[in-house]
Each structure stands twice: as structure tokens, then as C-alpha cells.
Amino acid sequence: MKILIIGAGGVGTSAAMIISRAKKEGEWAEKIVISDYNFARAEEVAKMCGGGRFIAEKINAKDKDNMKEVIKKHEIEFVLNAVEPDFNENIFETCYETGVKYMDCAMTLSKRHPEKPYELAYIKLGDYQFERHEKWLASGNMAIVGSGVEPGMADVFAKFAQKHLFDTIDEINVRDGDNYQIPGYEGVAFGFSVWTTIEECLNPPVIWEKGKGWFCTESFSEPEIFNFPGGIGDVEVINVEHEEV
């Protein structure tokens, strides 16, 4: 398989490194093109992965024609979107138009209700992609969306629990907390895109309840202290906007 990773930040680098360490029997990943607007960063990651089948390319995720050129040049079969979700629609549509399989870790952006943003849900995260399900199905192509930790693993865990562990479930909450630090750095340590982190905290959180359906609340609503396992301990958590809902 010929793979294009768009974005050589933390997510793209991690994906490339995992591929480089995987067993090579059958060489399922025969070419991995690591691309970024910052070509020097893409080159750095390709070298970290050992070069060879890992190739660096400069790419502009805002430019569909540029992405199509890279896809055609390397005969790409699969695209991993590892950039912030502001670029999702462009990359998603480029893959549809070129017939290339697609995967992302976060979904297309939401839009607030124009009159009651903290009461009524409007365009939710991922709505743009879900609305195009039938179109992708008819084309014979495949898009795996929201395949990160949350969304992604959290949804799988919830479904597994519902199917195999419990007779009934009254409520599902997804809580995310950590205590990681960057050596030598005293500021706040962000685990992924700073812009995305700030936006999901400021946007109206979306909640679904049986009998009520989708609705929104105030940002930073329902604060609570939650004791996380694994030595993390007590962390204050709040409602945020997130795709797994």
C-alpha cells in the first residue's frame, strides 16, 4: 500500500514511527510519503523513520490541486489526515475526487446555532462527513473518520461495554485528564493542536439525552473533580465540545 500522511506534527510523526517499527513481512506499507507545509519537518520525520520507503514531500492542505498532484505522483492509495480539523473538508473531498481511501483522527468542524448557541445544537462536529456517507458508499470508496483516542477508541470501548459487559447502561461520560509535562518547560503542555484545544473548550458543549435529543450547554459547564487512575489523581473536568458524542 502507498500511504500519504498529511501533517508531520505529533500525530503524523507518531503514525510514521509506528509504521517504521511494524513487522515488514509482506511489506504492506511499500511507500510512506510524509508531507507537510514545512518541508524541513517532513524531511526530518522521514529520516527519523530510516528513509528508504519513507519519502518527504511539501504539501498545502488548503490547495486541492496540490494534494492531487502529490497523490498522482506517488500513486497514493490511502491518505492519513494528521493535521488540525480546519483542513478536513478539503482533504476529505480531495480523497473522494481521486478515489483514494481516507482516515482522520478528528472530524469536520461545527457551527453554532445562530440564535441560541448555548441551548440548541446546530451543525455538529462530523455532520459534513456523515451527510456524505451514501455518496462515498456509491463510489465504492472508504473513509474512516474520527479514528483517534476520542473520538475513536472511546466509542469502541463504549460499544464493547454495552454489548459485552452490561445489561443496561444509564449514562456514558467520556473524561480526559492528564498530568504530563515537557522536560525543561514550565508552561502548559498541550498534547495536540493548541488551536483545537482552545476551540473545543470555548465552543458550546453538545450533549445527547434520551427523550430530549441533542442540546448544548454553556462552555465550562458542570465542573467536577474526577480522580483519574494510573497515578494522575484528581483533575477538575468540564463539559467541552467533542466528536464522540
Summary of predicted features, one role per range:
Residues 8-9:
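Glycine-rich Rossmann-fold phosphate-binding loop(s) that bind the pyrophosphate
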Residues 12-13:
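N-terminal Rossmann-fold NAD(P) dinucleotide-binding loop
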Residues 37-41:
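Helix N-cap at the beta1-alpha1 junction of Rossmann-like dinucleotide-binding domains, i.e.
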Residues 49-63:
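Rossmann-fold cofactor-recognition segment
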Residues 61-74, 87:
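Conserved Rossmann-fold cofactor-binding substructure of NAD(P)-dependent oxidoreductases
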Residues 105-141:
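Rossmann-fold NAD(P)-binding glycine/threonine-rich loop
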Residues 163-245:
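C-terminal catalytic/substrate-binding lobe primarily of soluble NAD(P)-dependent oxidoreductases
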